[in-house]
Every structure is written in C-alpha cells, then in structure tokens.
C-alpha cells in the first residue's frame, strides 16, 4: 500500500497535529498505553487503578461489565486497528496511540491512514469536523477495489485489474 499512500510531491504531513488533553486524561492514556505494551492487550476499565477511573455516572455499570468496559482502547501496534468511527471526533478514548512516550490519542492523519486515505488528501474545517470526515468515510482503498470490480463487470471483464 505504500504507493497508494505516498505522494513524492508532499514535503511534510498535513492534518497531523495532536489534540490537547487534560492532565487526568493524559494519566489514563499513559496507564493504558503502558498496560497494553506490557500485557499485549488494551486494558478494560476494571484494570485501571481506582485513582484513574473517570468520574462518570456509568463507571459502576462498566466495572460490572454491563457496557463501556473498553472505554479506553489502545490501538495496539501488533494487531489490526479497530474500526475508525465518527465517535473519534468526540474524544480519543477509543483511539489511544500505542507508544507510552507519546501519551495521546490518534491524530486526524493517523486515523485517515488507518482508513486508507492517501497522504495527499487534505481534510478541511475544524479538527472535530476532520475527525467526522474520516470516521464517516468508506475507506478509499476499499472503494477503489470495489470500483475496479464494478468496471470489470460492466465491461464484461474487458478491463484489466490494476495492480494496486
């Protein structure tokens, strides 16, 4: 996929700035990334020390396993990423970067990369809108592959599949 992503005309990376987080969230992200690195899995809410639990009304239900037990999800470098959805625009809790030294959620560009947007695709508007654009999109490489099949079907197989 390198040729799909890379554009030699670019002299940098766009949409790759991190969002700010309050100190308590940074502590949770640091714990989550360290836990994932050591355990090879993203932590469940029940794995968090009590001092790092969020002050939300549904935490008790989450600790009982009812829902939101995976509220803080690390995108592990050794596994496929989870599906990027538009919820990433609300907070980055489900999209924590795996490197503990970075202690942050994914940038728009990283989320876009996971969705297979080429690096030369520029997202406009406020960052929240950019995350929504990425999360609501059909992955471009998937759309490209489906389009090639549709063309072959409509042309009776006359067009040769591109080697992407």
For each feature predicted by the language model, list its residue ranges.
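C-terminal target-recognition/interaction regions appended to catalytic cores
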Residues: 1-164
